[in-house]
Amino acid sequence: MSKHGVEQLPAARALTWPQRLGQYWKLVRGDRPIGSLLLLWPTWWALWLAADGLPPLWTLLVFTAGVWLTRSAGCVINDYADRWLDPHVERTKSRPLATGAVSGREALWVFVVLMLVAFALVLTLNWLTVALSVPGVFLAASYPYLKRHTHLPQVYLGMAFGWGIPMAFAAVQGRVPLLGWLLYAANILWATAYDTWYAMVDRDDDIRMGSKSTAILFGRFDLIAQGILYALMAATLVLVGLRADLGVAYWAGLAVAALLVAYEFRIARHRERGPCFRAFLHNNWVGLAIFVGIAVAVAGR
């Protein structure tokens, strides 16, 4: 404890370079790719819809690499913001910043390097995409601090995670049509829902530590709220399909996604930590099902 009664974080431990690189890899969640996949699928939805088929190869590479870079940077800044909280939460107490294996200054440098590389890639695209990347950086950097001030950080996460959608339309079409904003809205609803599963895992710890989340806001009505979120997501994706004049494959993909979501409710119905976390992870397959539906639908025109 400090003289002011505030618990001190442990100092960064002396590590060999291989060990330190391993801690950096853990810091950016390289060992847990689920977050990158949840960010990748909606970005690919947008690229395939914007291009009405396979997008230009360089654009596809830039956005795919950008997904990993920005998600990794987001994890770093999230851990930096939560470095005082994570040591007290069961799920996060082994993170590199929480254990002292990586210092706060190191984490900020990792964040800056990742964002600079991502921005360098964006600079190879058109001016509108570059301009849209600026609010994207703000969303990614500010999200971790929302949980201290609002019960809706999951909504903000959806805004941050989905910002690649308008950027993808800008890169391919040079504009962001209504279709792009509909897809963005669907992603906000989806991300709010799947991150609420995640928040349900930490709900007891968050209440104890004074953090806020949709899981706490919804309380005993959490499953009802989840149902509403997923229903609104589905309705928005129906509008996407109608506006883009997508064929049977798309509707089949949505049907598969709906069945996958129903399974999530089945396994998480008792609100236990393990099943809620599995429901969160299961959204990878939801995103994949929708992507396959879009890709096959536009390929078959």
UniProtKB/Swiss-Prot annotation:
<feature type="transmembrane region" description="Helical">
    <location>
        <begin position="57"/>
        <end position="77"/>
    </location>
</feature>
<dbReference type="Pfam" id="PF01040">
    <property type="entry name" value="UbiA"/>
</dbReference>
<comment type="similarity">
    <text>Belongs to the UbiA prenyltransferase family.</text>
</comment>
<feature type="transmembrane region" description="Helical">
    <location>
        <begin position="245"/>
        <end position="265"/>
    </location>
</feature>
<keyword id="KW-0460">Magnesium</keyword>
<dbReference type="InterPro" id="IPR000537">
    <property type="entry name" value="UbiA_prenyltransferase"/>
</dbReference>
<feature type="transmembrane region" description="Helical">
    <location>
        <begin position="279"/>
        <end position="299"/>
    </location>
</feature>
<keyword id="KW-1003">Cell membrane</keyword>
<feature type="transmembrane region" description="Helical">
    <location>
        <begin position="34"/>
        <end position="54"/>
    </location>
</feature>
<feature type="transmembrane region" description="Helical">
    <location>
        <begin position="176"/>
        <end position="196"/>
    </location>
</feature>
<dbReference type="InterPro" id="IPR030470">
    <property type="entry name" value="UbiA_prenylTrfase_CS"/>
</dbReference>
<dbReference type="GO" id="GO:0005886">
    <property type="term" value="C:plasma membrane"/>
</dbReference>
<feature type="transmembrane region" description="Helical">
    <location>
        <begin position="221"/>
        <end position="241"/>
    </location>
</feature>
<keyword id="KW-0472">Membrane</keyword>
<keyword id="KW-0808">Transferase</keyword>
<feature type="transmembrane region" description="Helical">
    <location>
        <begin position="108"/>
        <end position="128"/>
    </location>
</feature>
<protein>
    <recommendedName>
        <fullName>4-hydroxybenzoate octaprenyltransferase</fullName>
        <ecNumber>2.5.1.39</ecNumber>
    </recommendedName>
</protein>
<dbReference type="GO" id="GO:0006744">
    <property type="term" value="P:ubiquinone biosynthetic process"/>
</dbReference>
<dbReference type="InterPro" id="IPR039653">
    <property type="entry name" value="Prenyltransferase"/>
</dbReference>
<keyword id="KW-0831">Ubiquinone biosynthesis</keyword>
<comment type="function">
    <text>Catalyzes the prenylation of para-hydroxybenzoate (PHB) with an all-trans polyprenyl group. Mediates the second step in the final reaction sequence of ubiquinone-8 (UQ-8) biosynthesis, which is the condensation of the polyisoprenoid side chain with PHB, generating the first membrane-bound Q intermediate 3-octaprenyl-4-hydroxybenzoate.</text>
</comment>
<feature type="transmembrane region" description="Helical">
    <location>
        <begin position="152"/>
        <end position="172"/>
    </location>
</feature>
<keyword id="KW-0997">Cell inner membrane</keyword>
<keyword id="KW-0812">Transmembrane</keyword>
<dbReference type="InterPro" id="IPR006370">
    <property type="entry name" value="HB_polyprenyltransferase-like"/>
</dbReference>
<dbReference type="GO" id="GO:0008412">
    <property type="term" value="F:4-hydroxybenzoate polyprenyltransferase activity"/>
</dbReference>
<keyword id="KW-1133">Transmembrane helix</keyword>
<comment type="pathway">
    <text>Cofactor biosynthesis; ubiquinone biosynthesis.</text>
</comment>
<dbReference type="InterPro" id="IPR044878">
    <property type="entry name" value="UbiA_sf"/>
</dbReference>
